[in-house]
Design a protein with these regions (language model features):
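DNA breakage-rejoining catalytic core of tyrosine-based enzymes
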Residues: 131-149, 202-214, 227-228
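Short, basic/aromatic-rich helical patch in the C-terminal catalytic core of site-specific tyrosine
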Residues: 105, 177, 271-292, 308-309
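Short, polar N-cap/turn motifs at the start of nucleic acid-interacting alpha helices
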Residues: 187, 288-327
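Active-site/catalytic core of tyrosine-dependent DNA strand-transfer enzymes
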Residues: 211-285
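Conserved tyrosine-mediated DNA breakage-rejoining catalytic core shared by Y-recombinases
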Residues: 179-218
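N-terminal DNA-binding module of tyrosine recombinases/phage integrases
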Residues: 1-49
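Basic, Lys/Arg- and aromatic-enriched nucleic-acid-binding interface segment
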Residues: 144-174
Length: 331
């Protein structure tokens, strides 16, 4: 007696049996132009598409088994599909993830219909009212244009505005520069400035070197007419620096678009968004530098991310988990 095939196995065999095959994917657009036939909706055109389809099938199968106890794809109804998508929405999935699932369900119905000779319909609708709005300004970086907007709005410099400008180059935490003194800055040739940070996060002492004319001029103005032991930012505190930036961003109308339909835009805030911007700029600069030196794209990316980790003050261990958060922050 043959072994009973699981629901996921049925999906998997249907996907693997797609005529395009995962060994010789064809280009979707060239396929249409060459054959001059209507699009065949069951076709899978890439390894990525196949992987996403298998992921959807796996999650969907688990839900159907738990909620409905069914064991055959022919037993799946459109109501069951909608129930699963609603469940995903209520669980906190983003709008983009839900749209991806909706599209994959439709593709799955075409795939199983061809493989098993069925006439299923897995069409669903993403109900926007069920999507939890998790839009958070903490997830975003300021864009280069927004940084320039804030710079242009500064009429009367203060400790908070000076820190904002400083951090847009160095990606420093406020806590890292609270005790920074004028003598901790060393000016070199070709507009190079080396910043010495003592007892940073984790008890590390470290240096940051920035070679930029604008930054050089800023640092010169910060130490002008001050004693070497004077605080560079006059005893700045995190709360005051963030309040200054938040007020500025609010006046300029710098917002994050809501991830849900009809959701309200949220104002960007916090100097952490400046830190994310600065490290993205630095990582890209280092990546380009390593490419010019002859490294492969993968090697250049790896080395640039290590440099970025050091610049952030997380050491030379190359914390990919931390770097990913900073580099993936959208603007």
């Amino acid at each position: 007696m043959g072994k009973k095939k699981s629901l996921f196995y049925q999906f998997q065999s249907s996907i693997n049996d797609s005529e395009s095959g995962h060994k010789k994917f064809v280009d979707k657009h060239s396929q249409k132009s060459q054959t001059e036939q209507e699009s065949q909706p069951w076709r899978i055109y890439s390894f990525s598409a196949k992987s996403n389809l298998l992921d959807t099938a796996h999650n969907f199968s688990g839900y159907l088994k738990e909620q409905y106890g069914i064991s055959k794809v022919k037993e799946i109804s459109s109501d069951m599909c909608q129930s699963w998508l609603d469940h995903c929405a209520k669980s906190g999935l983003s709008l983009s993830s839900l749209e991806c699932y909706r599209s994959n369900l439709k593709k799955l119905s075409h795939v199983v219909n061809r493989h098993f000779g069925l006439h299923t319909d897995f069409s669903t609708t993403v109900k926007h009212e069920l999507v939890i709005d998790k839009t958070s300004p903490r997830e975003f970086a300021l864009s280069k244009e927004e940084i320039e907007m804030v710079k242009s709005s500064i009429v009367k410099p203060c400790n908070s505005s000076n820190y904002f400008l400083f951090s847009s180059f160095c990606a420093t935490r406020i806590n890292s520069v609270e005790k920074l003194m004028c003598r901790d800055l060393t000016f070199g040739k070709d507009y190079a400035v080396t910043v010495r940070i003592l007892d940073d996060k984790g008890g590390r002492d470290r240096t940051i070197t920035v070679q930029d004319k604008e930054f050089y001029k800023l640092c010169r103005s910060l130490v002008s007419n001050k004693n070497p032991d004077s605080l560079l930012f006059g005893g700045i505190k995190k709360d005051s620096a963030n309040r200054w930036l938040n007020r500025r961003l609010h006046r300029l109308g710098v917002t994050v678009k809501s991830q849900t339909i009809g959701g309200k835009a949220i104002f960007k805030r916090g100097n952490h968004s400046v830190r994310k911007f600065a490290i993205q700029e630095y990582c890209q600069k280092q990546y380009n530098l390593y490419l010019e030196q002859g490294l492969s794209p993968d090697a250049a990316k790896s080395q640039a991310e290590k440099d970025a980790c050091i610049r952030l003050g997380h050491g030379s261990e190359g914390r990919s988990d931390i770097i990913k958060i900073y580099l993936s922050a959208g603007s």
